[in-house]
């Protein structure tokens, strides 16, 4: 009996660790895809920024078309029906020149960590509440520099609501708990 109790307690601790690691693990994986996406979009956005009119550039046109393009994807039992990325581009001073949500153009984002750190040659990321009264409304942003040769000319930041990851996290936690119940 003592052996089974010891095994049960050990299994409970292992299970608790697994469940606690699901959320940060999913967020770390998402952060990795955000930096890849930001870096790619920064390269694609360079001509838009150099043109002096990024609000009418290829990136802006692509996001405009994306908003009107329906899509459906069933990803492991989780339905996805819209783009969840929020993308904005700043100049080298941190002034927003393009915003996929059309809310921040002209604003100074130079003090936001994602922009501030990227403008200083560092890895720039932040998590911000969309609604200060709702702790579940956080959005993770990761930024990449927009370069013209060796000169930093701007920052492109990609954000994704943490709530968009909630179904994956909840499903993973349920599966771990269900599997442990079988054991």
PLM region spans:
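Juxtamembrane membrane-water interface segments immediately C-terminal to a transmembrane helix
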Residues: 17-45, 172-175
């Amino acid at each position: 009996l003592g052996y089974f109790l010891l095994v049960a307690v050990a299994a409970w601790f292992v299970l608790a660790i697994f469940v606690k690691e699901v959320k940060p693990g999913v967020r770390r994986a998402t952060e990795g895809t955000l930096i890849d996406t930001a870096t790619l979009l920064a390269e694609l956005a360079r001509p838009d920024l150099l043109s002096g009119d990024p609000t009418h550039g290829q990136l802006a046109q692509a996001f405009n078309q994306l908003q009107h393009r329906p899509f459906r994807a069933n990803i492991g039992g989780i339905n996805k029906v819209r783009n969840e990325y929020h993308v904005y581009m700043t100049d080298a001073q941190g002034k927003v020149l393009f915003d996929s949500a059309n809310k921040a153009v002209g604003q100074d984002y130079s003090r936001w960590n994602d922009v501030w750190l990227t403008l200083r040659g560092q890895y720039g990321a932040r998590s911000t509440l969309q609604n200060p009264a709702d702790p579940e409304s956080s959005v993770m942003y990761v930024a990449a520099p927009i370069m013209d040769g060796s000169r930093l000319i701007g920052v492109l930041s990609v954000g994704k609501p943490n709530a968009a990851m909630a179904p994956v996290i909840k499903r993973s936690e349920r599966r771990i708990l269900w599997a442990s119940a079988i054991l």
